[in-house]
Amino acid sequence: MIRAPFFFFSRALSGTCLGVWLGTQAILAADWPQFRGPQRDGIWDETGVLETFPREGLKIRWRHPIGGGFSSPVAAQGRVFVSDVEMNKPSAKERVHCFEQKTGRVLWVYAYAEKYGEWAFVPERGAGPTATPIVDGDRLFVVGANGYTHCLDVKTGAVLWEKNIGREYEVAEMSCRPSPLVEGPLLIVFTGAKPGASVLALDKQTGKEIWKALDDPVSNSSPIIINAGGRRQLIVWSDSSLASLDPANGRVYWREPMVTSNNDSVATPVFHRNRLLVSGLMLDVSADPPAAAFLWPAIRVPSKRILSNTSTPILQGEYIFGAKGWGELVCLEAATGRQIWSTNSLTASKNGASMNITPQGGAFFLFTDEGNLIRAQLSSAGYREISRAHLIDPTWPFLQTKYVYAPPAFSNRHVFARSEAEVVCASLEAGQ
């Protein structure tokens, strides 16, 4: 393996089901089966959720110790899945935990030995899996830090197939950070593998390679699928380009050079009404056949295209809400990129500040790097905080401050958050 340069941090979270949560009344409960939710857009559609938090804070249903990693929890079929690493120098063991959603009871744990470099045992380096697992039917797909990919049985944790991408291809050490996605019969993984296999499509039933594409270096950004220009498009933001691929065969529709440092290409692309927002770059992708037209910024300097190197913004109608450097939350005009307002009231963190924004029920949940969950109204008129509660203690040390970076999962009127020490479930159910 090639040794990857030290990365500042890693970023690395469909369908609905009828379920019963802590009671006998059946409710429509949305699973959160992959990175950033059912549609991979960060939106939580459940109702019956708290509008304000109790004075004493959120009710913690359960918590369980885990190891290091930046992958998000996922929740599906009454279960919660979290990947981590158990570090016992000089050895490392990557694991997948399955918990019962209601109680936190451990249902199964799958573990395998993985080779970690000497540098990975320094706490500030942030070792462990970053790619968030994805649930698809009765299968759970997990990608490890070095690309070791497993397909596990959701109920038992039994291995259905495995593929060690880090051994079969040329992959930079500890670099497989983007979260996988499922597209029809394919499991698509972005690992930066070479030669020509930066993006790989695998048969999700067998793990067999179906196609490979690009020679781009991997980034921290997870790919998405959009419908635009009359086509399904796979959008991939690497450390050297922004590309649109045909998810069926890997053919490139369009590609724009977009060189960044290893710290910058973090945000997941966001798509809404033919607009594609990639951190601080806005494109129109309505053309048929597929093509991209720049809307803003006018200056094609990499630094001008980065809104935040820690967080993914939210595109809501004609406005964008997202983190900006040094702990700011900003509102931008979607058509022009013009900043309308900013506030520093969410987090005391500056360098490395992070905000995960989740629209829900006409308001928003914001999860900060300090482990706080905030309920707020966001509009072009400004930021109005409704409630704030501490959810989980930050544990990852950087520059004499501790952070928690993994975005939480929201399911069954509950929130699930993880640090490098534990996973926590708290109730957001109204009327409890």
Report residues per predicted region.
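N-terminal secretory signal peptides that target proteins for export/translocation
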Residues: M1-S10
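Bacterial N-terminal signal peptides
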Residues: S10-Q25
